[in-house]
Every structure is written in C-alpha cells, then in structure tokens.
UniProtKB/Swiss-Prot annotation:
Induction: Down-regulated upon activation of B-cells. It is found in: Cell membrane. Residues 35-144, 153-241 form the Ig-like V-type domain. PANTHER family: BUTYROPHILIN, V-SET DOMAIN-CONTAINING T-CELL ACTIVATION INHIBITOR 1. Expressed on the surface of professional antigen-presenting cells (at protein level). Widely expressed, including in kidney, liver, lung, pancreas, placenta, prostate, spleen, testis and thymus. GO terms for molecular function: signaling receptor binding. Residues 258-283 form a propeptide. This is V-set domain containing T-cell activation inhibitor 1. Belongs to the immunoglobulin superfamily. BTN/MOG family. SUPFAM superfamilies: Immunoglobulin. GO terms for biological process: adaptive immune response; negative regulation of apoptotic process; negative regulation of T cell activation; negative regulation of T cell proliferation; positive regulation of interleukin-2 production; positive regulation of T cell proliferation; response to protozoan. It comes from Mus musculus. Negatively regulates T-cell-mediated immune response by inhibiting T-cell activation, proliferation, cytokine production and development of cytotoxicity. When expressed on the cell surface of tumor macrophages, plays an important role, together with regulatory T-cells (Treg), in the suppression of tumor-associated antigen-specific T-cell immunity. Involved in promoting epithelial cell transformation.
Length: 283
C-alpha cells in the first residue's frame, strides 16, 4: 500500500503533466493562430501601354506599422514592390519596375494589398507572389499575369464600297487575333468567302490594328464582328434598317474564374450610352 507521501508525489506529477499538456495546447493554438492568414489573389490581363492592377487581399489588421506587403515575380531577383511600417520601401526593388509600382496605401489596413502597375509591358507577364505579414500571422498567394493588347471594335457601313458592306475596326490587338463574322438571320453561315481581314502593325511594332470588311450585307439584319485571342474576346454588333443604324460592342477578358471582366458600350440611333462592369476574376 502506497504511503501518503507517495500518493502526494504522484498526484503532483500527474498535475504537472496535465498542466504541461494544457500549456502546450495553448501555445500550439496561439502559434497556429498567428502563423497563417488568408491571402487571396485575383487576376486579369494587362493591356500593353496602359496601367494595370495585380489584385491581392488579406485579413484586415488595424496595426498598419506591423503590416508587410511584398510582391515578387518568378525569375526576377529582388522585389517587385515592398510596403512596410506604413510606407513604401523600394531599396530592394528590381530595376525593371522602378517608377512603375504603387500600392493603395490608404486601403492597406482594410486588407487591400493590390499592386498598381504603370505602363504595362509585354515582359511583365509571368507568375507573381503576393506575400503578407501582419500581427496576426503571414501568408501568400500566386497569380498568373498575362499581357497583351485588346480593344473594342467599331462597325460602320462602308458607303465607299461598290456594294453594301460593313467595316469592322479595332485599333490595338496582340497577339494576332482571329476574326469571324456572324449574322442573326443566317445563323451558322460561313462568311469567310465574303469578307476580307487585314492586320496593320502599329508604330511601336508590337500591337496591330485589325480591319475586317464584310461584303453583300442585307438591310434589316444584325451582323456581328468577333475578334479573339488567348487574352480577350471582343464583339461588335450592328443593325442597319431603312431609318437608323444601331451599334453595340463588348470586350471580355478571358481568364479562369467565376466572373468575367466585361466592358460594353451601346450606341442607339446616334446617341451613345456607355456602361462599364468589370469584375476581377478569382484565381
């Protein structure tokens, strides 16, 4: 039979073991709670020569001075951009991004780590990482950024042609797109034999102007000019009647995600109505 001293001794040992386990669990939960935070990237294509956005969000943290945002690009030594202690730190920025990047500093505390990229270049395409560290923990997410050129087409009646024809023009595309015509009346018809498409290189020797002419068109019919490459798809519609001409155009960025990014414009009887609805696509 164990003595009173032995009972007390083993009781103390058991209490120590239980307390140690509890402390380990508390520390473990504390570390895990601070170690990982959710970082989400959104992706869309960059239009060469224009400004673009690499979108990234994270769990908000009101402690601005404790937030670190780093943008990195695969294959590039140094950083694309860094924001810490409430301001930009560009001491390690790669030279190809100098003077071209900025974060939305006033939105960092609400979880916006998106990067504004000025004057998008063809070489900006690639895999980027959005790395975040806050007082709550750290996390990162990747996104694929495509670059090219895309623009909305405009369709007009070509009164200079020998027969009724339509002229579809789009000022900037890259890579070279495909062009196809469609008709509401003649659905499924192949218009390749009654259309002519040309590509004219622009002055910067990268993007190209797209011109396509459709011949032998009929009145009271709606025609569509569709321009598409691996980045974007644009459609221009036109309906010519005896009394008026109605036009509509739409540009859709082709990226994986639940919501497409769509720009659209409608022109009815000479009056223009412009609407823009752009939804960033969740990667």
């Amino acid at each position: 039979m164990a003595s009173l001293g032995q009972i007390i001794f083993w009781s103390i040992i058991n209490i120590i073991i239980i307390l140690a386990g509890a402390i380990a669990l508390i520390i473990g939960f504390g570390i895990s709670g601070k170690h990982f935070i959710t970082v989400t990237t959104f992706t869309s294509a960059g239009n060469i020569g224009e400004d673009g956005t690499l979108s990234c969000t994270f769990e908000p943290d009101i402690k601005l001075n404790g937030i670190v945002i780093q943008w990195l690009k695969e294959g590039i030594k140094g950083l694309v951009h860094e924001f810490k202690e409430g301001k930009d730190d560009l001491s390690q920025q790669h030279e190809m991004f100098r003077g071209r990047t900025a974060v939305f500093a006033d939105q960092v505390v609400v979880g916006n780590a998106s990067l504004r990229l000025k004057n998008v270049q063809l070489t900006d395409a690639g895999t980027y990482t959005c790395y975040i560290r806050t007082s709550k923990g750290k996390g990162n997410a990747n996104l694929e950024y495509k670059t090219g050129a895309f623009s909305m087409p405009e369709i007009n009646v070509d009164y200079n042609a020998s027969s009724e024809s339509l002229r579809c023009e789009a000022p900037r595309w890259f890579p070279q797109p495909t062009v196809a015509w469609a008709s509401q009346v003649d659905q499924g018809a192949n218009f390749s034999e009654v259309s002519n498409t040309s590509f004219e290189l622009n002055s910067e020797n990268v993007t190209m102007k797209v011109v396509s002419v459709l011949y032998n068109v009929t009145i009271n019919n709606t025609y569509s000019c569709m321009i598409e490459n691996d980045i974007a798809k644009a459609t221009g519609d036109i309906k010519v009647t005896d009394s008026e001409v109605k036009r509509r155009s739409q540009l859709q960025l082709l990226n994986s995600g639940p919501s497409p990014c769509v720009f659209s414009s409608a022109f009815v009887a000479g009056w223009a109505l412009l609407s823009l609805s752009c939804c960033l696509m969740l990667r």
